[in-house]
Amino acid sequence: MQDQYILALDQGTTSSRAMLFDRQGNIVSIAQKEFEQIYPQPGWVEHDPQEIWSTQAGVAAEAVTRTGLNGTSIAAIGITNQRETTIVWDRETGQPVYNAIVWQDRRTADFCDSLKKQGLEAKVRAKTGLPIDSYFSATKIRWILDNVPGARDKARQGKLAFGTVDSWLVWNFTKHELHVTDVTNASRTMLFNIHTREWDSELLELLDIPRSMLPDVKASSEIYGHTKTTVFASKIPLAGIAGDQHAALFGQMCTTSGMVKNTYGTGCFLMMNTGDKPIESKNNLVTTIAWQIGDDVQYALEGSIFIAGAVVQWLRDGVGIIKTAAEIEALAASVPHTDGVYLVPAFAGLGAPHWNARARGSVFGVTRGTTAAHLARAALDSIAYQSLDVLAAMEADSGISIGELRVDGGASANDLLMQFQADLLGVDAVRPQITETTALGAAYLAGLAIGYWKNLDEVRSQWQLDRRFSPSMPKEQVEQRMAGWQRAVRAAKAWADDTQ
């Protein structure tokens, strides 16, 4: 297997990517293709499932061929994906019955409110580790069954399949043979009991979702099957699956209880490994399965921030104060602070630990002296503030004081943001040499399943430091800024709640 590589497929919210990794965990090749975001109505977000598949298959082939290799050089494929995004398709034709409803989509918020009013939140959280929220897959499936003509009848007849994006990719890679998912993706549906690790019949009944639609649930690291498509001439083992944040936690080698990572992508996703026992959150965090390797199941606490890097995209595309996302660091660094300006980027509601679906983006503290640079700095700062809110909740739930924060994702390359994050936290923000930890985690899971890497210790030894950011801001300054942020969040919530 010396000259073979692991192919990681990273199907994200805005693009499909593929990366080849060698035995040392180095990236040998990358291919990426963006795809269309569909916004049929305010608060609705969709993708075309066929475009998800075509772009992912395309970059998989491209990543391999651009290095002069072919399918025989691939030892295994690992898949990681945007979670919760919901696809329902016809088992016979393989055609989706509706567009993919994306994790950011809020169309089922009212239905979620009605479930909460029935007093079901405690039951759902006890079983799934999740709050009732339109973010998760369950109510999206229900919406498709209720709103696509003929869908419910077909589902009752066993003719429809539901899958998160990983399931859809495996289904297509195996020419409609395998309908599977892994425990991490299943744990994000609001239908999966994280204690028994089975689909929960009571929740399925409650939401009127037929069991026959659901995929078989597997470990995150095992050989599920082999590719059968024309993308590769040879049969390649599909051997690792994990939702993007779980894969990043693994890629960051947060393999012991109390270790935390933050992935700064479109949103921010913080996850803490809590070991082999699920901790029920008292602070509006999500309890989830970190991964399963063999019979070993690790659990995690997670806080999701809906808008992180997306606030930079908004400054570029919506407001036009920067032309490229890369410009923001220099613009923000041109002022020493925001001059009292706070931006609460609740464009799609507030995520953890607030979970307020109706809050909207707000800017406070604006004066005639406020400039584009102040707005840019406030936008970057908002990413760090939101992360701090989640980390404080994690410490409260777990009883563990965080020793350091491992960072990755696109915005972790922003030194100004990383330094401010360390200042707010009062602990080091630690950036690894390979920040593509999501894809790396998927590669590790697949490689371990086929013996490409011997064991966890071999994989753990590959993690290498790029830079450590240590706190340097005086405590009084930190407290003053945090108080301003908390005031801004309270004001954003008040605006959302005042609908008289």
Curated annotation (Swiss-Prot):
Pathway assignment: Polyol metabolism; glycerol degradation via glycerol kinase pathway; sn-glycerol 3-phosphate from glycerol: step 1/1
Any one Gene Ontology BP term: glycerol metabolic process
HAMAP family: Glycerol_kin
InterPro entries: ATPase_NBD, Carb_kinase_FGGY, Carb_kinase_FGGY_CS, FGGY_C, FGGY_N, Glycerol_kin
Matching NCBIfam families: glycerol_kin, PRK00047.1
Top enzyme class: transferase
Gene3D superfamilies, per the entry: 3.30.420.40
CDD domains: FGGY_EcGK_like
Identification of the protein by name: Glycerol kinase
Family indicated by similarity: Belongs to the FGGY kinase family.
Species annotation: Burkholderia ambifaria (strain MC40-6)
Physiological role: Key enzyme in the regulation of glycerol uptake and metabolism. Catalyzes the phosphorylation of glycerol to yield sn-glycerol 3-phosphate.
GO MF entry, a single one: ATP binding
